[in-house]
UniProtKB/Swiss-Prot annotation:
Reversibly catalyzes the transfer of the carbamoyl group from carbamoyl phosphate (CP) to the N(epsilon) atom of ornithine (ORN) to produce L-citrulline. L-ornithine binds at N163, D227, S231, M232. Pfam families: OTCace, OTCace_N. InterPro entries: Asp/Orn_carbamoyltranf_P-bd, Asp/Orn_carbamoylTrfase, Asp/Orn_carbamoylTrfase_sf, Asp_carbamoyltransf_Asp/Orn-bd, Orn/put_carbamltrans. It is an enzyme of class 2 (transferase). This is Ornithine carbamoyltransferase. The keyword Amino-acid biosynthesis applies. Keywords: Amino-acid biosynthesis, Arginine biosynthesis, Cytoplasm, Transferase.
Length: 307
């Protein structure tokens, strides 16, 4: 079903394929807990490329390859010759000769496309300016750990053009869930991608709505999610975005409008006092640390299925 394919965006996959990735993610978690991890990548080499700094993604991907019996080869920005002018396609061609898979955290999504087309091996999106599919899988895994397979309602509060939000929208649409996005009218997803997601949502019965009022978006939801207001590479518009989003902080008062057993989620890193108050992210409703841990298991699942 997956062997030899790449994972650049969840929109490229059918609902049953996403469900399979989640199913194997839960299996991987149990394998790790009981020290029975299969050697799915025995003898396999996986290149992990990082144009952007990384903590959770670096740890989860390198550890995933190692636990599955593979050999991780980590290259940071200063190690990549394309930062000195080499064609991305040339890097892809060379890596494709010596590794069995490539994971890449990149500034531009087109870099992933070029690696996929030139390398001939599975390529995995470890975060781009467009999306973060492994994060979305970990998000849904975390939600299901708390609420089972029930049709939960989710609210995202913050930047409506956020790459993490786009992957969340994609998986919500594919699985027929309900998502309410609280964001200023100036910050919306790309029209072309929102059109695709809306068409999928119509087919699956998913509900995705945008609100300017965060209290309206959060009312009655099971999950309240946020991300940083200023992503890496947006430093030149940082103050502008902070002004636009100053009324979109997740506070304890805002959480009261969700259901009683609602959880708070954040993909990290977090800026306490900016997009979320400390009492929320460090409080009893926070599922952030489970969410971060689950990044390992979804990565293990995807690598074992695709490589």
């Amino acid at each position: 079903m997956f062997r030899g394919k790449s994972l650049l965006c969840l929109l490229d996959f059918q609902t049953h394929e996403i469900e399979k990735m989640l199913e194997v993610s839960f299996l991987m978690k149990s394998y790790v807990y009981y020290n029975k991890v299969p050697n799915s990548l025995s003898g396999k080499r996986v290149a992990l490329l990082f144009e952007k700094p990384s903590t959770r993604t670096r740890v989860s991907t390198e550890l995933a390859v190692s636990l599955l019996g593979g050999i991780p080869i980590v290259l940071n920005k200063q190690d990549l010759q394309w930062s000195r002018g080499e064609l991305i396609e040339d890097t892809g061609r060379v890596l494709g000769r010596v590794v069995n898979g490539i994971g890449a955290r990149v500034l531009n999504h087109l870099t992933l496309v070029k690696l996929k087309e030139s390398s001939g091996v599975p390529v995995f999106n470890l975060l781009s300016d467009l999306s973060h599919p492994l994060q979305a899988l970990a998000d849904l895994m975390t939600i299901r750990e708390r609420f089972g397979n029930n049709l939960v309602k989710i609210a995202f509060v913050g930047d409506g053009s956020d790459n993490v939000l786009l992957s969340l929208m994609a998986i919500v649409a594919k699985l027929g869930l309900e998502l309410h996005v609280a964001t200023p009218k100036e910050l919306k997803p790309r029209d072309d991608l929102y059109k695709i997601i809306s068409e999928i949502a119509e087919d699956t019965g998913s509900v995705i709505e945008f609100h300017e009022d965060p209290y309206e978006a959060v009312r009655g939801v099971h999950v309240v999610y946020t991300d940083v207001w200023v992503s890496m590479g947006q430093e030149n518009i940082a103050e502008q975005k902070k002004r636009m989003l100053q009324n979109y902080r997740v506070t304890a008062d805002l959480m009261k409008y969700a259901v009683k057993d609602a959880i708070f989620m954040h993909c990290l890193p977090a800026n306490r006092g900016e997009e979320v108050d400390p009492e929320v992210i460090d409080g009893s409703k926070s599922a952030v640390w489970d969410q971060a841990e689950n990044r390992l298991y979804t990565t293990m699942a995807v690598f074992s299925l695709f490589i």
